[in-house]
């Protein structure tokens, strides 16, 4: 499995030896949840599929509450919020037999000094990024890209567009906008400018077939419940509902869409990498609002020391 290059999650049942093998890709892109109950193992790519089994109840224990209110929408690798439901952590394998359960990590990022020059490092990163994108363009289903006009999605779309041109094709790109956005938009640390202008500029430059999906506020609100059900746990409210509606629109014509999600974690795109107040915080940047989150809990649950 160390030789696998790509995203995956799979389960193999060895009937002869009476054991089950589960594995997940290095970054944990593909989900794989499981529950072990009364010598039975239930596994699925979604939590809701496991909860559909009557042996598993939809219960959230103390650990789940802590995960949700201290780290949400992120989750500690291996956790799944619900009691008696776990996930195979990224880059992990598990073997379940009648005798025991074995779990091990087959890969992890090594921490070592980079002796490359700035120019060499830049070229190395470029080679890896281009290779990763081109690998995702191989398939027998229609492929498009998300394009917000930011660095990450623009780089992906530009590389994909060039590859499509080499095949005699035109790349389709999609961006999202909101009704009356030009009237109500306010700059923030996470979004200093509106997407539409820059997305259109990039689309024009790379000569893609671009579509701007416009959503209204009423639809965003109405989709909040569906978005939460789709994720199986509470997430980022309107961010999730807008993504759900955006993907539904794209799904009318495309099965696969490449996006710049998670590039901020790799290339330092979040404000807490540079904002002094966030850097000087005594906790994780995403956990600074724990007090506000706890305010909606009932008095019994408030006693949990979520901060720890």
What are these regions (language model features)?
Residues 39, 98, 185, 191-194, ...:
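Glycine-rich active-site loop/lid subdomains used to bind and stabilize high-energy intermediates
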